[in-house]
Amino acid sequence: MKENKANKKGRKLLWETVIITMILSFMFFYVLYCSNNKYMTREEKAIHGLLYADGSYESFPVYYLSREWEYYPDALLTPEDDLDKYYFRYISIGEYGGMELGNSGRSPYGSGTYRLKIMLPSEQHTYGLYLPEIFSAYNLYVDGVLVGQMGNPDPDHYVERTQNRMFTFKANTSLEILIAVTDKSSASPGIQSVPVFGNPLKINTIRGIAVFINSSVFTLIILVLAFSVWAFFKTRSRANVLFAGVCLCVLGYTCYPLLHTYLALRVQP
């Protein structure tokens, strides 16, 4: 009888733990959805390829460029090209998983060009553009000038490279962003992560927080892994070996954003 009562009490405690964990998880993910959703931030969004970024430079917000880019499929364009001769449509970043624009009969790979125009205050200031990894090679033009390149998007001399990059430049009144992208093999061709535009200091603060969190988690996992290895040599328990293996897997996952912050790497399978 005592064993049955103990078993029932144990099962009840288990179910209570599972339910509480699920509730806390839902609350945590909901907070992330509300606070870290780059598609629902409060600043102005682009409409038909044009963003009005008004206000003084000191109070200039960070703009998540998620909406209505002009996208030119199957075209690796430069500022010298006459864009009126090419077909384009408006897309949101991440709207499609590749460059086929939802057409299952087409290949998701190839080349494409993204264009966005931003209206700015009349005074000249330094602005920043943060580009999370773009698959898998691109040229970045700002007001007709090549300000950055990752890999080589030329299909005949294609070199894939990805990295989280920050570019700064001076501008006033307006500017045009043109990103020419080529991808031949990755799982998510083109621009899938939302670019960020604004005051360089504010953007670097956001980047710094992300790097700090990733570095802290990475360090914590290394410490837990070291403790698991130490515990194995003390106890020779297989559970410690399995836990160390899990730590190694999580370590590999956690180091990915850190590597792509500091190094330009090939696309990993």
Where are these regions (language model features)?
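Solvent-exposed beta-strand/loop surfaces of large extracellular or lumenal domains
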Residues: 86-94, 145-163
